[in-house]
């Protein structure tokens, strides 16, 4: 087993102030900061103060797609950058991560919300020209800076989405172990333990997280870090992405007009997948409810019919063995699962 992990991790109030120190440790005096205008309006002055005396260029993006990746790459070449920083939520982080990877530069992750585990992982989520999702394995961040003073002020919905994404590791790990037993698939045990621990941290501390204190948000950030590193150790998203993610991706494909977030969908998918695994799905449902995350199709803004279709189509989306390959789902059983878990209302 070989793994590349972040060289520096700071999760505390004021972590943004460590950005110049991290860049110096990377031997870097010129950088590109990828962000969006909303994030910059909130924390831009802090970043400007931290980077005073260093050469940098700010690239504002609106979408995580190849055109914005190319803009970030062009900026990196123009200023002769020796690192690329992603400041913000999922989109700026993904664009910066992929631009850094394509340019052969270290990536510094500076999340302003913990809406999923992507801020610490080697995985990039982009959209192709047709709007279809792309998942690309790159390199993990060289450094991760989570400023709790900033992240704890993020919209509650984004943080609740992060809880949904992390508790989904309960079922992604179960799916990986199922694949090990039934197909002989190899997944490093340490990666599975890391992902398992991430989920357990959030479930054990959900009351503190639901209070949205810096300590609670810090637990969520640490769990996200652990999940991201689990993927780096495994060399794939396998420990952290199973049937619950397939359900989410299926919703993205078959209900593209919905407004739900990735982690919200994964959380509901984890309720369903826990039921299929024979787990106590109420533990996940109750944790999601405590932080205000959706637990029903109504909460996701989709219909029961949408969810049934997504569930039945989920296993077709990628070649990854999960509980969906074991349980012989049909429309009637899918409705039964959704109704018994309360994800869909009873008829």
UniProtKB/Swiss-Prot annotation:
One of its GO terms (cellular component) is cytoplasm. Substrate binds at residues 117, 165, 249. It catalyses: sn-glycerol 1-phosphate + NAD(+) = dihydroxyacetone phosphate + NADH + H(+); sn-glycerol 1-phosphate + NADP(+) = dihydroxyacetone phosphate + NADPH + H(+). PANTHER family: GLYCEROL DEHYDROGENASE, GLYCEROL DEHYDROGENASE 1. Homodimer. It is found in: Cytoplasm. Pathway: Membrane lipid metabolism; glycerophospholipid metabolism. This is Glycerol-1-phosphate dehydrogenase [NAD(P)+]. Belongs to the glycerol-1-phosphate dehydrogenase family. SUPFAM superfamilies: Dehydroquinate synthase-like (SSF56796). NAD(+) binds at residues 90-94, 112-115, 121. The keyword Chaperone does not apply.
């Amino acid at each position: 087993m070989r793994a590349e992990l972040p060289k520096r991790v700071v999760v505390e109030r004021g972590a943004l102030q460590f950005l110049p120190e991290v860049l110096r440790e990377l031997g870097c005096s010129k950088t590109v900061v990828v962000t969006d205008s909303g994030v910059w309006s909130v924390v831009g002055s802090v970043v400007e103060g931290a980077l005073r005396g260093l050469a940098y260029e700010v690239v504002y993006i609106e979408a995580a797609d190849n055109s914005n990746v190319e803009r970030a790459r062009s900026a990196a070449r123009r200023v002769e950058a020796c690192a690329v920083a992603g400041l913000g939520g999922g989109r700026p982080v993904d664009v910066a991560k992929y631009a850094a990877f394509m340019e052969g530069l270290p990536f510094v992750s500076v999340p302003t919300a913990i809406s999923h585990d992507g801020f610490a992982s080697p995985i990039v989520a982009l959209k192709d020209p047709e709007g279809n999702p792309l998942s690309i394995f790159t390199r993990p961040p060289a450094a991760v800076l989570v400023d709790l003073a900033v992240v704890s002020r993020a919209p509650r919905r984004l943080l609740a989405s992060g809880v949904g994404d992390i508790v989904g590791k309960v079922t992604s790990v179960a799916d990986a172990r199922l694949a090990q037993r039934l197909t002989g698939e190899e997944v490093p045990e340490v990666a599975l333990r890391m992902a398992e621990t991430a989920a357990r941290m959030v479930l054990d501390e959900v009351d503190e997280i639901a209070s949205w204190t810096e300590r609670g948000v810090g637990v969520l950030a640490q769990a996200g870090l652990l999940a991201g590193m689990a993927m780096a150790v495994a060399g794939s998203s396998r420990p952290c992405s199973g049937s619950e993610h397939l359900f989410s991706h299926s919703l993205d494909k078959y209900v593209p007009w919905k407004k739900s977030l990735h982690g919200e969908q994964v959380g509901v998918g984890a309720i369903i997948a826990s039921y299929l695994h024979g787990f106590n799905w109420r533990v996940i449902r109750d944790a999601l409810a405590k932080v205000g995350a959706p637990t029903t199709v109504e909460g996701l803004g989709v219909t029961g019919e949408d969810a049934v279709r997504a569930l039945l189509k989920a296993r077709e989306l990628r070649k990854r063995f999960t509980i969906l390959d074991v349980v012989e789902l049909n429309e009637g059983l899918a409705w039964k699962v959704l109704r018994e878990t309360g994800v869909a209302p009873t008829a």
